[in-house]
Amino acid sequence: MNTKTDEGLYEKAHKLFISKASIDEFAGWATPRQVDAVHRLLDTELANRERAKHDRLLRRARFPVVKGLDGYDFTNVRLPDGYMLDELLGLGFIPRAQDLVFYGKTGRGKTHLAIGLGMKAIDMGLGVRFHQTAELVLQLGKAKRDGTLETMLRDIGRADLIILDEFGYVPFDIDGARLLYQIIAGSYERRSIIFTTNIEFSKWGTVFADDKLAAAIIDRIVHHGRLLEFTGQSRRVSEALMFGRNTSAQPEK
């Protein structure tokens, strides 16, 4: 094999945990046609593994619906000063463990954007967990009663990005608030969280039934976070079948 072929084969073999010694032995007797066949075999195996990994990450994310960002209208999404759209779509906030708060009334596309960013993260090989917040609190409470809370927290902690959808839509009792706080505090400076909410920061104390707990959460989010405001008309209303509008539109949150 020539040097270029050697390097390519070694690289592919390394990704599949095939030893250099095995490739060296193969190189000693293989014909060019055999080398080409092995290249194609390894390419196929690598592609299959990438697809399997992508599918596994997608299942673990538990998105309610799969949505990309092709055609997403950012006209009514107000970014923080100095924060560019390319930075958001480049997912630079994830390796920096920065949080994003998507704030706006219902139907402005907050959940769609959160899922779209989560899909991009999966395409990059990153782990994502999507949770409707009130449902998550119920699941955490059940896990605590069943003695499986640590297992659940470890699973969530494996993610690079956590999406807490409809944050604050339903108030929590103090026990639920403390369980949710474990996830938020445990993610601080370790992984990113996207919150979608229609509740302004000043009212988060009513959601958590504890002003001090709410203040501690806000402090962590603000320290390494950015606020994106969603304005304009409800996308659901503008695309509603009831009014004879766009019949191909997907529901938005």
Segment roles from a protein language model:
Residues 11-65:
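Interdomain "pre-motor" coupling segment immediately N-terminal to P-loop NTPase/helicase cores
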Residues 97-113:
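Walker A/P-loop nucleotide-binding motif
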Residues 3, 27-32, 44, 62-63, ...:
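Conserved phosphate/pyrophosphate-binding and hydrolysis machinery centered on Walker-type P-loop NTPases
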Residues 97-101, 117-140:
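Conserved post-Walker A coupling segment in P-loop NTPases
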Residues 67-89:
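N-terminal pre-Walker A segment at the start of P-loop NTPase domains
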Residues 72, 114, 132:
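Conserved hydrophobic/aromatic pocket- or pore-lining residues that grip, position, or stack substrates
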Residues 91-92, 190:
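Non-DNA-binding regulatory cores of transcription-related proteins
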